[in-house]
């Protein structure tokens, strides 16, 4: 029994190490150039051991992306549950975390993700859930006086998403960093939907 428990703990630990190492490689180098051999070598494990846990790169990529997104969601849920944090605190934290997370990400990673059907399906479902949650969040912001009441937030969310897609499709990242692109699109939309009260808090947060 103790032996089985030890083996289970080892496999869980190894799985976590693989996910962490793989995601680091994917984020910095893109997906295509990272081979399963590279990940096995980085962890000093055999390729056979790696394939016993993940049968192919897409399976590994999917779980790595899922864990990455769940960690972000968990952070935002915990942050949002703090009663001292206003709507503006929450949305600023959301975009600050996004900007920090993407600062060192290779544009190739974002482009090449779209070539993996299972990952695309997962992200589409995740984005649909986030879209619905964002609509509820913006309505709360209207009630609290931070966001304008004359805005169609469904349109705002869809056009901001389309702007991000356009930046990737036209390879704008070759001219500007991903962080710069986000800062000049997302914060433009965000400032535009704010009331005077919201703008004051937004400007104060950006100045920090």
Language-model-detected regions and their locations in the chain:
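Basic, helix-initiating cap at the start of DNA-binding domains
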Residues: 1-29, 33-45, 59-62
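C-terminal peripheral helix-coil segments that are non-catalytic and often amphipathic
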Residues: 1-3, 136-140, 144, 173-208
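Short hydrophobic/aromatic patch on the recognition helix
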Residues: 44-54
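Hydrophobic alpha-helical connector segments
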Residues: 63, 77-104, 157-160
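Short, basic, alpha-helical segments at the C-terminal edge of helix-turn-helix-like DNA-binding modules
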Residues: 66-73
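Short linear capping/connector segments at secondary-structure termini
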Residues: 110-118, 204-207
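Amphipathic alpha-helical packing segments from all-alpha helical-bundle domains
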Residues: 119-146, 153-164, 169
């Amino acid at each position: 029994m103790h032996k089985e428990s030890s083996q289970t703990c080892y496999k869980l630990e190894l799985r976590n190490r693989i996910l962490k190492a793989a995601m680091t490689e994917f984020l910095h180098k893109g997906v295509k150039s990272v081979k399963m051999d590279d990940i096995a070598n980085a962890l000093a494990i055999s390729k056979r051991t790696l394939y016993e846990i993940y049968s192919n790169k897409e399976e590994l990529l999917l779980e790595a992306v899922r864990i990455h997104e769940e960690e972000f969601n968990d952070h935002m849920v915990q942050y949002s549950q703090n009663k001292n944090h206003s709507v503006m605190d929450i949305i600023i934290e959301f975009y600050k975390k996004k900007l920090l997370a993407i600062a060192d990400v290779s544009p190739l990673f974002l482009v090449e993700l779209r070539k993996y059907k299972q990952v695309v399906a997962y992200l589409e479902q995740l984005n649909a859930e986030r879209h619905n949650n964002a609509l509820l969040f913006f309505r709360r912001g209207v009630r609290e006086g931070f966001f304008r009441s004359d805005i169609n937030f469904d349109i705002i969310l869809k056009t901001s998403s389309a702007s991000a897609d356009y930046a990737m499709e036209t390879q704008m990242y070759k001219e500007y960093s991903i962080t710069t692109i986000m800062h000049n699109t997302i914060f433009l939309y965000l400032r535009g939907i704010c009331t005077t009260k919201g703008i004051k808090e937004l400007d104060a947060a950006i100045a920090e």
